[in-house]
Amino acid sequence: MIKQSPVKGKDKVKVSFILPGEAVTGTVSVVGDFNGWDPTAHPLRARSNGTRSVAVTLPAQHRFAFRYLDESGRWLDDDAAHGYEENGVGGVNSVVTT
């Protein structure tokens, strides 16, 4: 799931990337164009409602490819992404548009 809210007074958007708690065990991160596909940049944190999430502030009116990556190296897709695109290595990336 993806939630967005504008950052007041700036041309930026706070994007929350959210996964159901049962989707993965162990560490999972959101990786994408916005963080150089670095799995250490944005790990999802467990929430009291059973989900895992992380918020990332991104420039408004841009399109970003992303995926979730768990600690075993398994890629996860976001069923609520704004779109999907081939990633050039035989897979598909999720897309978020701010």
Label for each model-derived stretch:
Residues 1-12:
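Extracellular ectodomain segments of secreted/surface proteins
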Residues 12-61, 71-98:
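Aromatic-rich carbohydrate-binding modules that target alpha-glucans
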Residues 63-65:
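Short, conserved beta-strand segments of beta-strand-rich sandwich/propeller modules, principally
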